[in-house]
From Swiss-Prot:
Pathway(s): Amino-sugar metabolism; N-acetylmuramate degradation [regulation]
SIS domain location: 128-268
DNA-binding region: 37-56
Quaternary structure (record): Homotetramer.
One GO biological process term: N-acetylmuramic acid catabolic process
Protein name, as recorded: HTH-type transcriptional regulator MurR
Gene source species: Escherichia coli (strain ATCC 8739 / DSM 1576 / NBRC 3972 / NCIMB 8545 / WDCM 00012 / Crooks)
UniProt cross-references to SUPFAM superfamilies, sorted A to Z: Homeodomain-like (SSF46689), SIS domain (SSF53697)
Keyword check for Aminoacyl-tRNA synthetase: no
Lineage: Bacteria, Pseudomonadati, Pseudomonadota, Gammaproteobacteria, Enterobacterales
InterPro entries associated with the record: Homeodomain-like_sf, HTH_RpiR, RpiR-like, RpiR-like_SIS, SIS_dom, SIS_dom_sf, Tscrpt_reg_HTH_MurR, WH-like_DNA-bd_sf
GO MF annotations in UniProt: carbohydrate derivative binding; DNA binding; DNA-binding transcription factor activity
Length: 285
């Protein structure tokens, strides 16, 4: 379940005691084998129940399950570290050669994919695919890089017969949102989940009775609280990156999975439409 990743992405919503626990676990992950919740509570000056509740908040049944999972994650991470050149673990710097930058970016994208896929709740994903498949109309919202991901998904969905709107202009996005109806779906893409334009559109969609599906990070956010369904994405950040590259990689992995899942639901008809689309575009060459 990648608890270290969940801890990192949920930090903004931790209480003071929860932050103490998170800091301790990360600082001592290599030594957790010999740490009990009682010892930890005493050292941090908090109650054992606080530690158990923290573990449950992350999705574990209790501290023992969380502790063992963290030990396993640490061991797996060490194995990967030993297999990679040490200089690939730092952020990209202005002194890096293009070859080193390429290797770092590649690894960053790999991690974004691995961590995002590890967080998938596939039963929930299947339910989301079914909800989208029944929608008379689908709106996709997003800003910046997220808008590019949304536009790509909209083209894919239109290719297999879905009625989709994905407008770049935020005023148009808001206008479409207020016209949605019960049964319609809004797919809101925002890693932060706090962009006011996207939140406004989600509020309008909910008010109209549409189903809101958020593709966002694990952190608590206004969009996450508004959504009927969430699809979690994980992405690291680096100092010398001018664009959210790994974020888009993670988001694309989610949208591509949605698309393939929808094709699978109605494979014969979907493949016919994809073939017709290909034949038509070939005639334009």
């Amino acid at each position: 379940m990648l608890y270290l990743t969940k801890i990192r992405n949920a930090e903004s919503e931790f209480t003071e005691n929860e932050q103490k626990i998170a800091d301790f676990l990360r600082a001592n992950v290599s030594e957790l084998q010999s740490v009990s919740s009682r010892q930890m509570a005493k050292q941090l000056g908090i109650s054992q129940s606080s530690i158990v509740k923290f573990a449950q908040k992350l999705g574990a049944q209790g501290f023992t399950e969380l502790r063992m999972a963290l030990i396993g994650e640490y061991s797996a991470s060490r194995e990967k570290t030993n297999a990679m050149a040490l200089h690939l673990h730092s952020s990209i710097t202005s002194d890096d050669s293009l070859e080193v930058i390429a290797r770092k970016l590649n690894r960053e994208k790999e991690l974004a994919l691995e961590q995002t896929c590890a967080l998938f709740d596939y039963a929930r994903l299947q339910k989301i695919i079914e909800v989208i498949s029944k929608a008379p109309f689908i709106q996709i919202t997003g800003l910046g890089g997220s808008a590019l991901v949304g536009r790509d998904l909209s083209f894919k969905l239109m290719k297999i017969g879905y009625r989709v709107a994905c407008e770049a202009d935020t005023h148009v996005q808001a206008t479409v949102s207020q016209a949605l109806k019960k049964g319609d779906v809004q797919i809101a893409i925002s890693y932060s989940g706090s962009k006011k334009e996207i939140v406004l559109c989600a509020e309008a969609a909910r008010k109209q009775g549409a189903t809101v599906i958020a593709i966002t990070s694990l952190a608590d956010s206004p969009l996450r609280r508004l959504a009927h369904f969430t699809l979690d994405t994980v992405s690291g950040e680096t100092e010398w990156r001018s664009s959210s590259m790994s974020t888009r990689t993670a988001q694309n992995s989610v949208t591509d999975l949605l698309f393939v899942g929808l094709v699978q639901l109605n494979d014969v008809e979907s493949l016919k439409m994809i073939q017709r689309s290909s034949e038509l575009t070939q005639r334009l060459k």
